[in-house]
């Protein structure tokens, strides 16, 4: 499938991207930072009024890394496009610095080749069709936090109640896929730590 790549277990690689939601009357521009685990398809999304390296790092710090820590795992690498919110001088760029501090490898999509991050593109399309189009028909949002509350409800349902046909999901929910592969991920991480100690 186009946009798919090899991933070994939950936490092995996540994909992150920015999704421009639009301009809301009385609110202004709304951007979504999106993260999806490329193995289990567990997703996270947080809304902002701008797209910057700080907002990109905030999603990881506020939602993504605490989730992995809660399950005794680490995020090993992340795939992004080459947008300015993700790429810059590693010594001064807040997102690049955050990844370095958290020891997360950073892979970038090929230039002018967004389909290499196709997993997150498909996720955005699903969100647009199943959440945003419906939400904006039903309600006028006065604040980003109001929209975030409804998005969080949808995200919980997506992760915990909706069967997924992803490569490793086999019709299970993303969260069930994540939990089922949890032991594999922990064994892989322990094995990599042991190998690193032997090589040191």
Residue ranges of model-derived segments:
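C-terminal domain-tail junction helix/linker
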Residues: 1-6, 10-11, 102-104, 126-200
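Mobile-element integrase/transposase regions
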Residues: 1-36, 42, 58, 197-200
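Residues immediately flanking
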Residues: 18, 38, 50, 82, ...
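Buried hydrophobic side chains on well-structured beta-strands
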Residues: 41, 78-80
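Short small-residue beta-strand/loop micro-motif enriched in glycine and branched aliphatics
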Residues: 42-46, 107-109, 133
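Active-site beta-loop-alpha junctions of metal-dependent nucleic acid enzymes
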Residues: 46-73
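Hydrophobic beta-strand scaffold residues
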Residues: 75, 105-106
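RNase H-like two-metal-ion nuclease catalytic core shared by retroviral integrases
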Residues: 80-82, 86, 92-99, 106-130, ...
